[in-house]
Amino acid sequence: MNRLGAERRPFLFVIDYKQEQVIVEEPDQIDSEALLYNLDGVTNVATASRMNDRENRTSAIRWETFPITQSAYADSFHKVVGHIRAGNSYLVNLTCATPVRTDLSLKDVFVSSEARYKLWMKDRFVVFSPEIFVK
């Protein structure tokens, strides 16, 4: 990343939260069969394939979520507030795992999402967000 940045060459990086798995690739080296991204319009997804995948669906989407309890969220929220008040942080993104049951594939979720920032990695995960985390 340092070398590419110093050379002012664009790159995509993906790092898991445990910092155990890292991907750093230049856009022209990314295999779109294995990884798709759309970062506020900077994308390797062809417009025609996006629309065709979405329009080919004939049945309703099955989508069921299993969020944490309000009490569990409140506990996490109060912990974050305590750290902010203690001066340990001034910016926090409080998130929690929410299991989802659906008949969509991970790629279907990517294609269906209208988020400004999204990424799909074949057979691994999909992620999407309305906001950028690193700029």
Segments the model singles out, each with a brief description of its role:
Residues 1-135:
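Extended alpha-helical targeting/anchoring segments
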